[in-house]
Swiss-Prot record:
Cellular compartments annotated: Cytoplasm
GO MF entries: structural constituent of ribosome
Miscellaneous information on this protein: There are 2 genes for eL36 in S.pombe.
One Pfam family in the UniProt entry: Ribosomal_L36e
Record-given protein name: Large ribosomal subunit protein eL36B
GO biological process terms on file: cytoplasmic translation
Subunit structure: Component of the large ribosomal subunit (LSU). Mature yeast ribosomes consist of a small (40S) and a large (60S) subunit. The 40S small subunit contains 1 molecule of ribosomal RNA (18S rRNA) and at least 33 different proteins. The large 60S subunit contains 3 rRNA molecules (25S, 5.8S and 5S rRNA) and at least 46 different proteins.
UniProt-listed InterPro entries: Ribosomal_eL36, Ribosomal_eL36_sf
Family from the record: Belongs to the eukaryotic ribosomal protein eL36 family.
Main location: cytoplasm
């Protein structure tokens, strides 16, 4: 908005835009600290599912396409499969750094 113009598309008073709180729909899917903490503890206690162990083994043997196909078969969609592959790859990398 232009400052105090009387005519034209930008006519009107100069205003400061209201600072509205964030909508809950904008936060959807964002992981909270508590949820992340609980999931990490569950992962520590329960370990990996059998299909996850198999996928990790395939990734280690550089059979990425086969791993992606297996994950897609088990999880239903390619998007979920890619996310799982990414997660398991980071787990493998962190375990390599630990040793």
């Amino acid at each position: 908005m232009a400052p105090g113009l009387v005519v034209g598309l930008n006519k009107g008073k100069t205003l400061t835009k209201r600072q509205l709180p964030e909508r809950p729909s904008r936060r959807k899917g964002h992981l909270s600290k508590r949820t992340a903490f609980v999931r990490s503890i569950v992962r520590e206690v329960a370990g990996f599912a059998p299909y996850e162990r198999r996928v990790m083994e395939l990734i280690r043997n550089s059979q990425d396409k086969r791993a992606r196909k297996l994950a897609k078969k088990r999880l239903g969609t390619l998007k979920r499969a890619k996310g799982k592959i990414e997660e398991l790859t980071s787990v493998i990398q962190s375990s390599r750094l630990a040793h």
